[in-house]
């Protein structure tokens, strides 16, 4: 019996950066769960983006998001948190490089310096 099937999302199940999953996969995921097989989708994406891809089967699938730092399923969530002092050190070091842009991801959120207005979406 197959106990676990793990797959990448971007470039494997969907075209890079899209939400276009073949609807037939939803039935496959449900059938695998019925048979007792865990389906695990992994991505560097944030959780909200992955949830949009798998909305019809969120109760039937587990996923790894944020480049491996978060694991989610219907009944479980694990988030690996980096010590804030280490983050501060990395930010200070990165600021030494001209043109280096810093984005810090937290489960379902990205923090960017206010000076990076060229990277933000318009508000109107």
Ranges and model annotations:
Residues 117-123:
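Conserved small/polar residues in nucleotide/adenosyl-binding loops
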Residues 3-16:
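Asp-based phosphoryl-transfer active-site loop
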Residues 1-3, 59:
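Short loop/turn microsegments at loop-to-beta-strand junctions
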Residues 17, 123-124:
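A very general structural signal that marks isolated residues within well-ordered alpha-helical segments
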Residues 10-12, 68, 122:
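Anionic group-transfer/hydrolysis microenvironments
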């Amino acid at each position: 019996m197959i106990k676990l099937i793990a797959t990448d999302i971007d470039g494997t199940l969907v075209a890079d950066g899209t939400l276009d999953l073949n609807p037939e996969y939803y039935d496959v995921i449900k059938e695998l769960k019925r048979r007792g097989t865990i389906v695990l989708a992994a991505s560097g994406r944030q959780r909200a983006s992955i949830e949009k891809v798998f909305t019809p089967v969120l109760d039937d699938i587990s996923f790894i998001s944020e480049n491996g730092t978060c694991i989610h399923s219907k009944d479980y969530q694990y988030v690996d948190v980096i010590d804030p002092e280490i983050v501060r050190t990395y930010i200070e070091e990165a600021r030494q490089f001209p043109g280096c842009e810093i984005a810090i991801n937290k489960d379902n959120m990205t923090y960017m310096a206010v000076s990076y207005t060229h990277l933000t979406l318009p508000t109107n």
